[in-house]
Amino acid sequence: MSLDVVVVMDPIASIKIAKDTTFAMLLEAQRRGHRLHYVRPGGLSLREGRAVAQVAPLSVREDKTSWFTLGEFAELAFGPGQVVLMRKDPPVDAEFVYDTQVLSVAQRAGAQIVNDPQGLRDYNEKLAALLFPQCCPPTLVSRDAAALKAFVLEHGQAVLKPLDGMGGRSIFRSGSGDPNLNVILETLTDGNRKLTLAQRFIPDITAGDKRILLVDGLPVDYCLARIPQGDEFRGNLAAGGRGEGRPLSERDRWIAAQVGPEMRRRGMRFVGLDVIGDYLTEVNVTSPTCVRELDAQFGLNIAGLLFDAIEAGAAQ
């Protein structure tokens, strides 16, 4: 079965192919004989009630100096026999939401969207973990700086995050006795106007912030522990963390079993769970990463698992 695979992503010319999960997906789709189409950034539209996109034929190759070739752009109407990989990075701002609404129209026309556009709108990556409270550390989400401060003082040390960030940006560790706590909370809440997440600090972060990948609700057998370096407490690779592959622990599998069935039910075929120690901290649904690192360390083909699920869905 040959499919038209349409990718919505950040500019392909700027990716780092050694680490880019979307690139791994494109390589696998091409290997299977599917036709690749690249959506011009900002190229999704609605025309007379139909979802359309400005796309160009795309070919990819494992060459760090010349990894893609594009043909001429033309308008494509979405419909059956198409798979759309929605792989734009956060922030999930108004333009991102509008794109998911266009993709919902494409879905109704018969295209398969990965991940489900309604799910992308519903699941904030920081808040989605709280749908599984049995998996999470003590957490408070509030605009009230005084309440957030009381939470920090109650737990001694806490991590403070905005709800719309990625890659470890604007994440603070603070605690009782920190002279900067008030200004951190003023900044994150924008004077009690923006929801901010406070989470009890988990000392196990020194052993790594684990990324567990779910494909169609089932966990990959290995995770990537992103280990903070030096005096940094953030393990994110974008913040300088070192990636180390590990087999899943029993607790990791338990967490995956709590989250996976709901993700599959909602059409979230490719999801990244962030786990520190025994606790789930985030559920990443927009553009989860770490496929390339895990494939390289363990000889896996995680994108192959994803396309097995996609092809099974297309055959129904």
Curated annotation (Swiss-Prot):
Positions contributing to ATP binding: 151-208
Enzyme class: ligase
SUPFAM superfamilies noted in UniProt: Glutathione synthetase ATP-binding domain-like (SSF56059), PreATP-grasp domain (SSF52440)
UniProt-listed Gene3D superfamilies: 3.40.50.20, ATP-grasp fold, A domain, ATP-grasp fold, B domain
Enzyme Commission number(s) of this protein: 6.3.2.3
PANTHER family per UniProt: GLUTATHIONE SYNTHETASE, RIBOSOMAL PROTEIN S6 MODIFICATION PROTEIN
Database matches in HAMAP family: GSH_S (MF_00162)
Name of the protein in question: Glutathione synthetase
Organism: Xanthomonas axonopodis pv. citri (strain 306)
